[in-house]
């Protein structure tokens, strides 16, 4: 990735041009630039799959830009029919981070897993952008939330988010801690954006009639579920690809956004934005997200000033 001046994108039929106020960095951005995502825009392209932007008539909206003109830019185009009003209680960076991660969390926990008040929810990567959204949504639903993280700094973040129990997978036995905390029952719902070893551990500590919601493979390994194990333990494995709802049931996406806006207005959810970076730092932000070293959300803000160059740099 490199920063270049290019012409402003021209809206196609049914599209509008938006001025980008903030663009959230998502794991799909890392996959896009590696050529590993299910969508492969023609080169050259600009990544950035969700933004908070401003319409030409001054409305503040949330949108998914039309690739190849992604959100790490000053202007994008997006389908007019899919624009959502940005909540007034959130700033631009927070609004940009409310969409995909929180919609995924809401559909995963409520539509797919049918999370109930009083149930125990286990969230992997609880200090990350996707995981922190699931933690907040789980608490808002009245669940007891167990957050799994990697490292002390991320453990502190998960505690601040309100997790009832935080497990540092680098220093603790995840399965044993879950069994101990739940008096041997296990977690009713597991929210897994990681895959690999996280999924393997989930299958060992999911409750009778529990539900494992698979939302991604940020760990880099796609697990192979043992269906005989699911059979003898009576648990469900649920897949979630939020983009299908946007394509097949846009009314459900709008209803979810209305609910998320209400939760934000009541202070029950608020995207955890850890950094706001200028366009010049977008490539570094994507790399750090891919490396798994971040907490919360990194958001690209085109109007943010670039960091001063070190002595001799850029000359």
What are these regions (language model features)?
Residues 149, 197-268, 301-315:
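Glycine-rich phosphate-binding loop and adjacent beta-alpha segment
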Residues 7-24, 32-70:
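Glycine-rich beta-strand-centered segment in the early N-terminal region that forms part
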Residues 173-184:
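Short amphipathic alpha-helix with an adjacent loop that forms part of the alpha/beta core around
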Residues 125-126, 194, 217:
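NAD(P)H cofactor-binding loop motif with strongest signal on the N-terminal glycine-rich segment
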Residues 289-296:
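Glycine/proline-rich active-site loop of Rossmann-fold NAD(P)-dependent oxidoreductases
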Residues 49, 61-127:
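NAD(P)H dinucleotide-binding glycine-rich loop of Rossmann-like/cofactor-binding domains
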Residues 60, 120, 144, 210-211, ...:
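Short glycine-centered segments of the SAM/dcSAM-binding site in methyltransferase folds
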Residues 98-172:
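Mid-domain Rossmann-like dinucleotide-binding core that forms the NAD(H)/NADP(H) cofactor-binding site
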């Amino acid at each position: 990735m490199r920063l270049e001046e290019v012409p402003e994108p021209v809206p196609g039929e049914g599209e509008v041009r938006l001025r980008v106020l903030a663009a959230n960095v998502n794991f799909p951005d890392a996959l896009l630039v590696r050529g590993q995502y299910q969508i492969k825009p023609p080169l050259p392209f600009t990544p950035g799959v969700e933004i908070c932007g401003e319409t030409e008539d001054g409305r503040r909206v949330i949108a998914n830009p039309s690739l190849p003109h992604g959100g790490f830019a000053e202007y994008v185009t997006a389908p007019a029919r899919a624009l959502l009003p940005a909540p007034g209680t959130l700033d631009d960076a927070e609004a940009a981070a409310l969409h995909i991660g929180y919609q995924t969390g809401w559909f995963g926990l409520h539509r797919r897993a049918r999370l109930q008040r009083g149930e125990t929810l286990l969230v992997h990567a609880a200090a990350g952008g996707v995981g922190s959204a699931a933690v907040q949504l789980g608490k808002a639903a009245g669940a007891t939330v167990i957050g799994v993280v990697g490292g002390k700094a991320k453990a502190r973040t998960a505690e601040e988010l309100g997790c009832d129990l935080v497990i540092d997978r680098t220093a603790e036995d995840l399965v044993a801690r879950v069994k101990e905390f739940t008096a041997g029952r296990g977690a009713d719902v597991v929210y897994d954006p990681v895959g690999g070893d996280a999924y393997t551990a989930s299958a060992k500590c999911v409750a009778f009639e529990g539900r494992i919601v698979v939302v991604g493979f940020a760990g880099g390994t796609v697990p192979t579920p043992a269906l005989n194990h699911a059979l003898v333990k009576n648990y469900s494995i649920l897949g979630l690809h939020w983009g299908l709802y946007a394509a097949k049931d846009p009314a459900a996406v709008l209803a979810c956004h209305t609910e998320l806006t209400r939760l934000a207005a009541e202070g029950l959810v608020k995207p955890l934005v850890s950094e706001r970076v200028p366009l010049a730092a977008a490539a570094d932000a994507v790399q750090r997200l891919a490396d798994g070293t971040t907490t919360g959300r990194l958001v690209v803000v085109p109007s943010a000033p670039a960091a001063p160059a070190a002595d001799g740099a850029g000359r």
